[in-house]
Amino acid sequence: MLHLIASLKNLMMKNYHGLVLVLVIVLASGAAQEALGAAAVKQRTFSSPEEGVRALVDAAKSNDTKELLNILGPEAKSLIESGDPVSDRATRERFVTSYYEEANKLVKSGDSKMVLQTGKDDWPFPIPLVKENDRWRFDTSAGKEEIINRRIGRNELDVIQVCLAIVDAEREYYQRDPDGDSLLQYAQKFISTKGKRDGLYWETKPDEQPSPLGPLVARARGEGYKGAGGKPIPYHGYYYKLLTGQGKDASGGAYDYLVRGKMMGGFGMVAYPAQYGSSGIMTFIVNHDGVVYQKDLGAKTASVAQSMTKFNPDKTWTPVKQ
């Protein structure tokens, strides 16, 4: 349990440089996302780069998503969804408190371009300010690819740790026998049936031992936990699905993990991006041995991953360095 808690805590505390950029362009809720899609927005311009930066930081502080879109322009619409609104909100706050307020400066890059650098490491904000007709604006299109690449990199690093945390959770579940039937088995689902402990997560009272898995990870299961907007909620931009068997390319050969309806022979899992090319590229698989593999499943990632029932890391899957 301690390893699991530490793994998830580390995910929340990591300050990857690539995390910072998302804070100013992601939305806090599904309702805000719908509002942003309404009408074309004319981008705001500024009399100086300093004025532009102040406006950006003020909008981030106040979580004013409408003003952020005005500042960054219509190009920002396609960058708004990172796949995890909870993480996005925390990242946005961290940009202001841990980076901008720690240190900030504008660095000249040519006669008509300025780049905002923040934090003690002078992290460059990926969207530069450019001068046009004696006015300054954020050139979102110039930073678009970099933003997506950094988001994907951050998510994929986090998801590898989530995979290992789920392995820990399954092992703990097996040892604890939480359903009390005296049969040591792994959980077949992430969220328990109401009133039962047949999944990796269940609600507990303050004086009770926590369930092996936290609610945020559990609700990102592939079959689709429905949030307030009626859509599944990813965790670090990914969905997760448990597998009930393994194929011939897995260690030990092909066999089912289920024995008379109980998952006693092992467990497997697949993690795939909620939005291929935006929240992630790689799909990850892992089983009870704890070795994570990755593969780019291409444009049909979601349908391929959703149809998976067995853990089968053939030669097209690559082990992840852990």
Predicted regions and their residues:
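N-terminal secretory signal peptides that target proteins for export/translocation
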Residues: M1-N15
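Bacterial N-terminal signal peptides
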Residues: V20-G30
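Short, low-complexity N-terminal intrinsically disordered segments enriched in polar/charged residues
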Residues: L36-S62, G143-D168, E172
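Short, well-ordered alpha-helical segments enriched in acidic and aromatic residues
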Residues: D64-A76, Q185-A187
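Surface-exposed, charged secondary-structure patches
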Residues: A76-F125, G229, I233-P234, Q246-K248, ...
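Short beta-strand edge/turn micro-motifs at domain boundaries
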Residues: K113-L157, Q161-L164, V291-K295
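Flexible, glycine-rich surface segments
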Residues: Y173-S278
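C-terminal soluble interaction/assembly domains
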Residues: G265-Q322
